[in-house]
Amino acid sequence: MDYKTSGVDIEAGREFVSEIKQAVEGTHTSNVIDGIGGFGGLFRIPVDSFKKPVLVSGTDGVGTKLELAQSKNFHFEVGIDLVAMCMNDIITCGAKPLFFLDYIATGKLDKKQLLQVVQGISHGCGENNCSLLGGETAEMPGFYSNNKYDLAGFCVGIVDEDKLINGKKISENDLIIALKSNGVHSNGFSLVRKIIQNNNQLDKEFEKVSHLNFYDELLKPTKIYNNVVNQILSENIEIKAMSHITGGGIPENLPRCIPSDFIPYINTNSWEIPILFKFLKEKGTIPEKDFWNTFNLGVGFCLIIDKQFKDSILNICKDHDIDSWEIGKIVRKNDSTISKFLPEILT
């Protein structure tokens, strides 16, 4: 018996590395010192551009969205999801992404599938001037089934310590600007999959009420907000805090970037919740609180700013084809504001 007989094909792994080389190296900036194939990725940190450079790291996956995406052959899209989930986290403190690493684990190496995944990762990186510096593809027979894979991503960025965005400058009456999501993004899919299991004709019913393809809408890749945030900051517009709206929705994620003596007042009438979310709520009979604490409901990212910058930010978002709007404001925390300003769903 040899390694291949036991389920690990070393030669197929070598061929896969060769096939992804063009996509990976297409993301490399001038700071990448060497190509793929070494034991470690080498990256020259652009310290000359910063007074006190601070590295910022983030890691994430795509969750159980992978199960549904793999069954519908949305492999390229989940590659973008992987980059988005990591990159959107690290940019909240003002960091510019430098490089990305990926980890792919599978029961049996399907080069056609995983090439699409890596192409998606490369696309997400390339669109955001972030080098795909390296990765690992692990063939694990008996641990994963042959037609399944899992993904993890790791993103590293850089910011000047004096320009860190941490919410400490937030004050009363600052505005909260919402940036529209691309759909469900990569959270809540354990609930989504259960709803699908319990409703055989869900895709046809959705198409009937929306005239949209259910799985095309459901599996849209997570929006990456790096470029729009980077432009806002490059125009010397102060952002006091940012929040990536992921698992836990607005109620869980927005308060994370706000000092404890303030709370966010969210005007829930300031936007129309997209039809996909309403459809899932109806078909899954999801309670209101769970609805808000599971999905982003059309809000993928939030900025907290002084009101003087509102129009400039909305215009920049428009230039990037991202819908944005004033979703609320910051109020000082006390018993009266909690009962007066926060809707019941957010308490």
Curated annotation (Swiss-Prot):
The keyword Ligase applies. NCBIfam families: purM. It is found in: Cytoplasm. Disulfide bonds: none annotated. This is Phosphoribosylformylglycinamidine cyclo-ligase. GO terms for biological process: 'de novo' IMP biosynthetic process; adenine biosynthetic process. Its main location: cytoplasm. InterPro entries: PurM-like_C_dom, PurM-like_C_sf, PurM-like_N, PurM-like_N_sf, PurM_cligase. The keyword Secreted does not apply. It holds the Pfam family AIRS_C. Belongs to the AIR synthase family. PANTHER family: TRIFUNCTIONAL PURINE BIOSYNTHETIC PROTEIN ADENOSINE-3 (PTHR10520:SF12), TRIFUNCTIONAL PURINE BIOSYNTHETIC PROTEIN ADENOSINE-3-RELATED (PTHR10520). One of its GO terms (cellular component) is cytosol. It catalyses: 2-formamido-N(1)-(5-O-phospho-beta-D-ribosyl)acetamidine + ATP = 5-amino-1-(5-phospho-beta-D-ribosyl)imidazole + ADP + phosphate + H(+). Keywords: ATP-binding, Cytoplasm, Ligase, Nucleotide-binding, Purine biosynthesis. Pathway: Purine metabolism; IMP biosynthesis via de novo pathway; 5-amino-1-(5-phospho-D-ribosyl)imidazole from N(2)-formyl-N(1)-(5-phospho-D-ribosyl)glycinamide: step 2/2. One of its GO terms (molecular function) is ATP binding. Its EC number is 6.3.3.1.
